[in-house]
Amino acid sequence: ELTVVGSGWERSLLERLAESLGQAGMVTFKEHLDDKDKNIELQNAHILLHTSVREGWGLNVIEANAMGTPAVVYPVDGLVDSTIHGVTGLVCEEETPDSLAVEVMNLVADPEKYHMLRQNAWGRSHEFLWEKVLPNTCNWLENLASGKI
């Protein structure tokens, strides 16, 4: 089963594609989710697929990791920073559906690796808790404002 969250200009194309492939019953499309519903979706997900070709950071990767859900991502700036290949998730070799499919199939075929990625993803997500991030960010901003950097 595949759940696609969000809206965009390709949504209707994806809905028609699922229908034409006879997979409409296996694909669920959801609009914007509030934090509670988003967390439920991420907890229930086996894998987060992130196929953006431009990304600043990949916050939803860390959010998924916090729910114990590893990500399979395209090899673009931001996503390669939020995903440690083979440790917290997988980074595709190319920005293509075929490359994504290879990574997903390899992961599905290796339950031990999947379990390890889940544990590591959850553990790494704790590095991004406000209690850890906020002091460093404040120090950096203070140094920037005072001309130290």
Where are the regions that the model predicts?
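A short, well-ordered alpha-helix in the C-terminal region of glycosyltransferases
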Residues: 99, 106, 113-127, 139
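Conserved acidic donor-binding segment of nucleotide-sugar-dependent glycosyltransferases
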Residues: 85-86, 90-97, 106-111
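Short alpha-helical donor nucleotide-sugar binding micro-motif in glycosyltransferases
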Residues: 32-33, 40-45, 137
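C-terminal alpha-helical cap of glycosyltransferases
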Residues: 130-149
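Aromatic "clamp/platform" in nucleotide-sugar-dependent glycosyltransferases that forms part
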Residues: 53
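Nucleotide-activated donor-binding/catalytic signature segment of Leloir-type glycosyltransferases, i.e.
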Residues: 13-33
